[in-house]
Amino acid sequence: MSKKLANFAQKRWISCSSNSFNMYDPRVFREPVSNVQELRKPLDVDDERNFLFLKAMKSDATPVFYRDSVIDKLIRVCTKDGEKETSRKNVLSALEIIKRRQYKAWTKANDEEKKSIELDPFVIARKGIKNCHPLMKLQGVTRGGTTYQVPFPIEEPEAEFRAMKMMRDICRVRAKHGETHFKDILATELLAASQNEGSTITAKQELHKTCEANRAYAHYRA
């Protein structure tokens, strides 16, 4: 038995050793600093970063003025056929459209109305996506040869992804039918969703109604 186990281990199926091949030697490299305020601070004399190298910064962690984790995720969700740059251009153009529309409304409003108009498109986009978060999802469960659509609760990260996916699909369908460009539809949907309106909010409500109608199948979750 021990001989068979030794032969099995020699074939590299079992290994208790850590990977020693790493492009960033932990003795030489340190994590990069992505916070702009931290970058502006001078290093202490005894700071080890004066003598060591820094790892290459990830593309989604670069300290730029428009960096936002929710917007970055929306860009990834809207990417089609690997064209991430096109997706980024569409999403940022949608945010620019939101900014222009809100500023136009702000210039026409009186002093009292101006206080309630949000001009930051990132705040509007985050609020709109947050309002579209579904609380439940439908998942197929097979029992006795029959597949039932069973409602399941979902965690916050998945709810955010499903909200973005619903909004993306609605915008793509409307853009394909020639209503207008994707960026214009996305801007309209984000603005409407921030007010709990729009097609994505309607799709979320319909999903909740279906989950409520299928609650009799909830015992199939186990």
Swiss-Prot record:
Protein location: Mitochondrion
Record Pfam families? Ribosomal_S7
Among its keywords, does the record have Mitochondrion?
yes
Q: Name one GO cellular component term.
A: mitochondrial small ribosomal subunit
Q: What is the superkingdom listed in this entry's lineage?
A: Eukaryota
Show the GO MF annotations: mRNA binding; rRNA binding; structural constituent of ribosome
* GO process terms (BP): mitochondrial translation; ribosomal small subunit assembly; translation
Transit peptide located at 1-14
The record's section on SUPFAM superfamilies has: Ribosomal protein S7
Keywords noted in UniProt: Mitochondrion, Ribonucleoprotein, Ribosomal protein, Transit peptide
**CDD domains assigned to the protein according to its UniProt record, in alphabetical order:** uS7_Mitochondria_Mammalian (cd14870)
Oligomeric form and interacting partners: Component of the mitochondrial ribosome small subunit (28S) which comprises a 12S rRNA and about 30 distinct proteins.
Record-linked PANTHER family: RIBOSOMAL PROTEIN S7
Protein name as it appears in the record: Small ribosomal subunit protein uS7m
Q: Which organism is it from?
A: Caenorhabditis briggsae
